[in-house]
């Protein structure tokens, strides 16, 4: 039985906070006056929680008091299988759902989390992050931190995904640097539930996430501890990260994907891309004047067909009508986002890039040559090779389209 296909970025990230269901939207409107009152009240209570957490030293008493006060704020922290927690392990690995995951885990056990891509500041400290130096020195600093002999030892809580997801469908690819710190890590799973609205939105700031957390009746964070995992003999950091990712995904009932934070940024960019309107044409590839939008669509589809001759014309037209952009259509066809039955390419048609020279040398652009077709030893390496080939095909198809446009303009 084949494994289920990995979910795309549109299933890993929520773009809308409000529910689409009419009944839930009505319930949210009725709850709004109560939620606003709770928000104002909890803002004042939250200030007291912050002062208490700063005044009390790190201890079991402090965690109990702050955890109780956070429950009043609507942030409920629960844990399962706490007996599996090994206090000798210095690196904790978790999936990432909200900007406050590290605060919730810190209510259950002592831990420190570095803030990536941000300089040390008061905001960094007030949010409960560990202040570190530049990203270049991060790994070495964390290794020294874990190697310290201070008692009791403070473990590191790291999020290898580096970006938050909606916590429902799958996990982002785990970065390898958290697994280069020590040879033993203890993973944990984090599930977040919240009524009426989405738990997190892809382009929201931590301030807006905090306000929504104080607005809703409650947000439940469920932490489940897993057994510590040791690096196998000769196992690379990437393979270690992939093994832990698959274990965490299995415990969550989700799928470990190969998507990265860069894919999230690209997905957000596509969401902001304007759709095709009847009276407008795309700015990237100007179309010749035509009497109707249908004729324009046919002309653009025919040009894409010349670049990708194995794709049926009706498939190209359908995706162009949906995206309104040649760039996105070529990307979807090359990445397999659009299902189709390939057509037989005639002998006179051009194929995709090979080791031969490009047909249009006058453009001054160098066509990337695909790498040798070797079968990598690890699944991670095979996936990386596939991504490189897909990117090369995409750039080649895009370049051919531009060159045909330039020739017709001349």
UniProtKB/Swiss-Prot annotation:
Sequence ranges on the Cytoplasmic membrane side: 1-20, 42-410
Phosphothreonine: residues bearing it: 367
Keywords of this entry: Acetylation, Endoplasmic reticulum, Lipid droplet, Membrane, Phosphoprotein, Ubl conjugation
Residues covered by region (Disordered): 259-293, 348-367
Membrane topology category: Peripheral membrane protein
Domain CUE: 296-338
SMART domains: CUE
Superkingdom of origin: Eukaryota
Gene Ontology annotations for the cellular component aspect, listed alphabetically: autophagosome; endoplasmic reticulum; endoplasmic reticulum membrane; lipid droplet
Phosphoserine found at: 292, 363
Post-translational modification: Monoubiquitinated and diubiquitinated.
GO molecular function: ubiquitin binding; ubiquitin conjugating enzyme binding; ubiquitin protein ligase binding
Family matches, as Pfam families: CUE
InterPro entries linked: AUP1_CUE (IPR048056), CUE (IPR003892)
Intramembrane residue numbers: 21-41
Residues that bear N-acetylmethionine: 1
Entries under SUPFAM superfamilies matching the protein: Glycerol-3-phosphate (1)-acyltransferase (SSF69593)
Localization per Swiss-Prot or TrEMBL: Endoplasmic reticulum membrane; Lipid droplet
GO biological process terms on file: ERAD pathway; lipid droplet formation; lipid droplet organization; lipophagy; protein localization to lipid droplet; response to virus; retrograde protein transport, ER to cytosol
Comment field on protein domains: The CUE domain is required for interaction with the ER quality control machinery and misfolded substrates, ubiquitination, lipid clustering and interaction with AMFR but is not required for localization to lipid droplets.
Family listed: Belongs to the AUP1 family.
Subunit structure: Identified in a complex that contains SEL1L, OS9, FAF2/UBXD8, UBE2J1/UBC6E and AUP1. Interacts with the cytoplasmic tail of ITGA2B, ITGA1, ITGA2, ITGA5, ITGAV and ITGAM. Interacts (via C-terminus) with UBE2G2; the interaction recruits UBE2G2 to lipid droplets. Interacts with ubiquitin ligases AMFR/gp78 and RNF139/TRC8; this promotes interaction of UBE2G2 with AMFR and RNF139. Interacts with apolipoprotein APOB.
Reported function: Plays a role in the translocation of terminally misfolded proteins from the endoplasmic reticulum lumen to the cytoplasm and their degradation by the proteasome. Plays a role in lipid droplet formation. Induces lipid droplet clustering. Recruits ubiquitin-conjugating enzyme UBE2G2 to lipid droplets which facilitates its interaction with ubiquitin ligases AMFR/gp78 and RNF139/TRC8, leading to sterol-induced ubiquitination of HMGCR and its subsequent proteasomal degradation. Also required for the degradation of INSIG1, SREBF1 and SREBF2.
Name of the protein in its database record: Lipid droplet-regulating VLDL assembly factor AUP1
Origin organism lineage: Eukaryota, Metazoa, Chordata, Craniata, Vertebrata
The encoding gene: Aup1
């Amino acid at each position: 039985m084949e494994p289920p296909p990995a979910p795309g970025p549109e299933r890993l990230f929520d773009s809308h906070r409000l529910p689409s269901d009419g009944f839930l939207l009505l319930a949210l409107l009725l709850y709004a006056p109560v939620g606003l009152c709770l928000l104002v009240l909890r803002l004042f209570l939250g200030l007291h929680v912050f002062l208490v957490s700063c005044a009390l030293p790190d201890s079991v008493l402090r965690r109990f008091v702050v955890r109780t006060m956070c429950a009043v704020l609507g942030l409920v922290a629960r844990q399962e299988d706490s007996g599996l927690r090994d206090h000798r392990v210095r690196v904790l690995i978790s999936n990432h759902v909200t900007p406050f995951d590290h605060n919730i885990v810190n209510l259950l056990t002592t831990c420190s989390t570095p803030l990536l891509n941000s300089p040390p500041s008061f905001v960094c400290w007030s949010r409960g992050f560990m202040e570190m130096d530049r990203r270049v020195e991060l790994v070495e600093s964390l290794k020294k931190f874990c190697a310290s002999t201070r008692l009791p030892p403070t473990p590191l809580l790291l999020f290898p995904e580096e970006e938050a997801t909606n916590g429902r469908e799958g996990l982002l690819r785990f970065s390898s640097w958290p697994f280069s710190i020590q040879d033993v890590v203890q993973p944990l799973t984090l599930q977040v539930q919240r009524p009426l609205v989405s738990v997190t939105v892809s382009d929201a700031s931590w301030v807006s996430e905090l306000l929504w957390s104080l607005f809703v009746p409650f947000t439940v964070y469920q932490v489940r501890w897993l057994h510590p995992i040791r690096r196998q003999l000769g196992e690379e950091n990437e393979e270690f990260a992939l093994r832990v990712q698959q274990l965490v995904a299995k415990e969550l009932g989700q799928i470990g994907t190969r998507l990265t934070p860069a894919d999230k940024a690209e997905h957000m960019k596509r969401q902001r891309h304007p759709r095709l309107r009847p009276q407008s044409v795309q700015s990237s590839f100007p179309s010749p004047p035509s009497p109707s939008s249908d004729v324009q669509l046919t002309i653009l589809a025919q040009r894409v067909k010349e670049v990708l001759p194995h794709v049926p014309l009706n498939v190209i037209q359908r995706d162009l009508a949906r995206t309104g952009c040649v760039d996105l259509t070529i990307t979807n066809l090359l990445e397999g986002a659009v299902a189709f039955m390939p057509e037989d390419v005639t002998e006179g048609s051009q194929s995709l890039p090979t080791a031969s020279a490009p047909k249009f040398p006058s453009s001054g652009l160098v066509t990337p040559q695909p790498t040798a077709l070797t079968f990598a030893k690890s699944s991670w390496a095979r996936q990386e090779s596939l991504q490189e080939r897909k990117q090369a095909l995409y750039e080649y198809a895009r370049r051919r389209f531009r060159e045909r446009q330039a020739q017709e303009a001349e």
